[in-house]
């Protein structure tokens, strides 16, 4: 039997395999998607003929709809090609679907194996990178018994860098690509306190959210103020007499107001 449309499979499966869609949940975080439970092999589809394109389309549709249970059942029903030629499992949509199922079932070892051994196209990178990082975050949280803070997540990212199979090789810092950070720095030099409109414009230009843009500017202002305070302290230690100190000691800013930012300025991001 050959299906004209990918989702014809789902309708046909209800007739040929009544329990395919209505079977009780079989996914658990302790079971690998590569090893279905006992008796589950009866869900294989003898006599049904799918093209590789149709199988890929079914995987993509079920992935997009978020139906992980049915996606897992469909993957387990696929035949195993033992001769290694034109294997269905080598199709990117099938590999990505297996990675999605492994992630949602907590089979992180299997997820890492899939991501490290199959080279994915750029279109899949963003989603797979997010799964790679989130899986490592969850494992670290479970090991430490507490939620991870920003520094903890940074250390996890340094310990488990993205594999080149899901990464284009461009250097990243705090998950922002270098070209994104360069654009942020250019705007910061022009205006370290962008209004909501400018934040939205910059967010559109960088692919970030307005909140991410606002947080980056806030953190950059804090770092600049800390560096300015350190420089003033070092200057005071070198020239302790009043002649060398900055004029207007009760002010937290330089007289020109350009070199240092005021510590009293608001860093609120409520206007995002």
Curated annotation (Swiss-Prot):
Record's keyword terms, sorted: Developmental protein, DNA-binding, Homeobox, Nucleus, Repressor, Transcription, Transcription regulation
Molecular function terms, GO-annotated: DNA-binding transcription activator activity, RNA polymerase II-specific; DNA-binding transcription factor activity, RNA polymerase II-specific; RNA polymerase II cis-regulatory region sequence-specific DNA binding; transcription corepressor binding
GO terms, biological process: apoptotic process involved in development; cell proliferation in forebrain; epithelial cell maturation; eye development; forebrain dorsal/ventral pattern formation; lens development in camera-type eye; lens fiber cell apoptotic process; lens fiber cell differentiation
Pfam families according to UniProt: Homeodomain, SIX1_SD
Disordered as annotated region, ranges: 244-272
Primary location class: nucleus
GO CC, alphabetical: nucleus; transcription regulator complex
Residue range(s) of DNA binding per entry: 169-228
InterPro entries in alphabetical order: HD (IPR001356), Homeodomain-like_sf (IPR009057), SIX1_SD (IPR031701)
Subcellular location: Nucleus
Family label: Belongs to the SIX/Sine oculis homeobox family.
Role of this protein: Transcriptional regulator which can act as both a transcriptional repressor and activator by binding a ATTA homeodomain core recognition sequence on these target genes. During forebrain development represses WNT1 expression allowing zona limitans intrathalamica formation and thereby ensuring proper anterio-posterior patterning of the diencephalon and formation of the rostral diencephalon. Acts as a direct upstream activator of SHH expression in the rostral diencephalon ventral midline and that in turn SHH maintains its expression.
Assembly and oligomerization: Interacts with GMNN.
PANTHER family attached to this UniProt entry: HOMEOBOX PROTEIN SIX (PTHR10390), HOMEOBOX PROTEIN SIX6 (PTHR10390:SF12)
UniProt-recorded name of the protein: Homeobox protein SIX3
Native species: Oryzias latipes
Lineage: Eukaryota, Metazoa, Chordata, Craniata, Vertebrata
Gene that specifies this protein: six3
């Amino acid at each position: 039997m050959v299906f004209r449309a990918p989702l014809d499979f789902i309708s046909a499966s209800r007739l040929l395999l009544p329990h395919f869609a209505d079977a009780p949940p079989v996914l658990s975080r302790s079971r690998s998607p590569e090893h279905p439970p006992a008796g589950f092999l009866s869900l294989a589809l003898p006599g049904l003929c799918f093209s590789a394109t149709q199988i890929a389309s079914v995987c993509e549709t079920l992935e997009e709809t978020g139906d992980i249970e049915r996606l897992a059942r469909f993957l387990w029903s696929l035949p195993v090609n033992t001769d290694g030629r034109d294997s269905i499992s080598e199709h990117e949509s099938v590999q990505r679907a297996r990675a999605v199922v492994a992630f949602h079932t907590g089979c992180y070892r299997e997820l890492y194996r899939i991501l490290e051994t199959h080279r994915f196209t750029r279109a899949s990178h963003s989603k797979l990178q997010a799964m790679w990082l989130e899986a490592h975050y969850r494992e670290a949280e479970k090991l430490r018994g507490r939620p991870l803070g920003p520094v903890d997540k940074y250390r996890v990212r340094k310990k488990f860098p993205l594999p080149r199979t899901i990464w284009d090789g461009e250097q990243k810092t705090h998950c922002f690509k270098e070209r994104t950070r360069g654009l942020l720095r250019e705007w910061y030099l022009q205006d370290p306190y962008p209004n909501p409109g400018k934040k939205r414009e910059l967010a559109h230009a960088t692919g970030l959210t307005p909140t991410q843009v606002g947080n980056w500017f806030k953190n950059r202002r804090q770092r600049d103020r800390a560096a300015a305070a350190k420089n003033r302290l070092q200057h005071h230690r070198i020239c302790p007499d009043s002649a060398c100190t900055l004029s207007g000691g009760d002010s937290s800013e330089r007289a020109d107001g350009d070199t240092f930012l005021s510590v009293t300025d608001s860093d609120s991001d409520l206007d995002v």
